[in-house]
Amino acid sequence: MQFTRGLLALVILIAPALAPAEECEVELFVLGAGQDAGAPHIGYPDDPAWADPALGQTATSIAVVDHVAGERFLFEATPHVTRQLQLLDTLAPADGPGLGLDGVFLTHAHIGHYAGLMYFGREGAGADGIPVFVMPRFAAFLQGNGPWSQLVKLENIVIQPLAAETPVQASKGIHVTPLTVPHRDEFSETVGFVIVTNASKTLFLPDLDSWDEWAQASGIDLATRVVELDHLFVDATFFQDGELTGRDMSEIPHPRVKDTMERLSGLSPELRQKVRFIHYNHTNPIRFPASPESALVSARGFDVARAGDRLCLAP
């Protein structure tokens, strides 16, 4: 399988559509890799992306495309969904009119993961019956609260309830299984998704509180999951403690990138290279490819997901 590093965002957006790097039946595309609010970040005037937009980042989202069936599935509807669908159209154009989405899978009800649904309504795309796959509490939240309830009423979206650890067939070549994980669940459950093809299993897990809490709840630790899966896109919100000035980061539960790397340091290089860090905060230095922290991630045998990356899930 081949993991191809994406081009610079500006080049991607103006270039003609790119063919897959190899013959590939099911392909994953990284559309964004930042934390919910992206970068430059609101209330952060010193962010270098204000002066250089090329340093900006959009919130975390991936797409999985079944090239055989001509179907495209979006994972997370972010506040940057307009730009991200334009990127997807450049990398893997839709076969027909409209948004060309055959389903949207949402992990939880925090702004960076579902707020982009607002663009599917009559003020935006005026979408027609896009299936939106969510857990039961999340479904009730969307159905019972505006403006999301209007999307349901007008059938811009059609809610497809999920059940934990129960796979759904997205297309002939793709099955998706939600796994509940510990996180702030004010309005919905939080899940990661295992995306299964005939050749691979991929974990998409942008948000959780603690590897230990998840292992205790599920009975499976992170190292075991790395062994059992082929690719893992995991929470990299913070690189280490001390990133947020004036904040007690012990009160902000997310696995730190340094801790995750240390936990997996005993695994072989072949296993460590399965892990790709995603959902990094604007304060996390791995957002910059040339940073010492990004170099450290590579030196330890891991990778950092970047917008424009593509990964073949079924050759």
Where are these regions (language model features)?
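Cap/insert and terminal regions of metallo-dependent hydrolase folds
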Residues: A199-K201, D209-R310
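N-terminal signal peptide c-region/cleavage motif recognized by signal peptidases
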Residues: I14-P16, P20
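Cleavable N-terminal signal peptides
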Residues: L8-A9, A19
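A short, active-site helix/loop in glycosyltransferases that binds the activated sugar's phosphate group
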Residues: R137-G146
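Core dinuclear metal-dependent hydrolase active-site scaffold
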Residues: E22-T90, A94-G96, I159-R225, D309-P315
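Active-site neighborhood of phospho(di)ester-bond hydrolases with catalytic His/Asp-centered motifs
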Residues: L74-T78, G100-H113, L117, F133-M135, ...
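Di-metal (Zn2+ and/or Mg2+/Mn2+) metal-binding site signature of metallo-dependent hydrolases
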Residues: H80-G126
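Bacterial N-terminal signal peptides that target proteins for export
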Residues: M1-L7
